[in-house]
């Protein structure tokens, strides 16, 4: 009887273990099937969610690149306008006559800003070859555009050591209070800068220059 009880007890334990094992298998099988069924749904949803997200990211990156390119372009334009030696002239209310092609016409004067660097004598010769002279400042009112000049340019003003005066190419004497002469270097020639200032410079130093032609 004890053997039978032991056998029944062992059988009950085995059945219990088998039942538990079957339950575990069933759970695992259910879990596996559920995951297999869930994965396509998740992947499908992921694909559905990823596609707009990827598209948005692509647009954001493209806009970022476009912004960087635009900033670079505008920076280059700004720097070029900041350091460019040529001057943009407001022509409102101005009067003018015929000028050489591509020259600036302002109040019966023609101006050309040359970016090539020459010494004073070479600059003078270049202007003369175009039937013009180096810049002559004679009126703050008629030549108010010269306030916009940002860089240093040769003008037709030269120092006469014998009498200490400053004369223009045509021999006329510099009018008082027309230009503020500033000694930048030892020399007998003058550069024009902004706000009606003249800077003394060695005549052999290469600089850009302004040619001027009167139309009347």
From Swiss-Prot:
Single GO MF annotation: signaling receptor activity
InterPro entries in alphabetical order: C-type_lectin-like (IPR001304), C-type_lectin-like/link_sf (IPR016186), CTDL_fold (IPR016187), NKG2D (IPR042169), NKR-like_CTLD (IPR033992)
Chief location: membrane
Entry's Gene Ontology cellular component terms: cell surface; external side of plasma membrane
Extracellular side: 73-216
Cytoplasmic side: 1-51
Localisation: Cell membrane
Function (record text): Functions as an activating and costimulatory receptor involved in immunosurveillance upon binding to various cellular stress-inducible ligands displayed at the surface of autologous tumor cells and virus-infected cells. Provides both stimulatory and costimulatory innate immune responses on activated killer (NK) cells, leading to cytotoxic activity. Acts as a costimulatory receptor for T-cell receptor (TCR) in CD8(+) T-cell-mediated adaptive immune responses by amplifying T-cell activation. Stimulates perforin-mediated elimination of ligand-expressing tumor cells.
Subunit structure: Homodimer; disulfide-linked. Heterohexamer composed of two subunits of KLRK1 and four subunits of HCST/DAP10. Interacts (via transmembrane domain) with HCST/DAP10 (via transmembrane domain); the interaction is required for KLRK1 NK cell surface and induces NK cell-mediated cytotoxicity. Can form disulfide-bonded heterodimer with CD94. Interacts with CEACAM1; recruits PTPN6 that dephosphorylates VAV1.
Name of the featured protein: NKG2-D type II integral membrane protein
Taxonomic source organism: Pongo pygmaeus (Bornean orangutan)
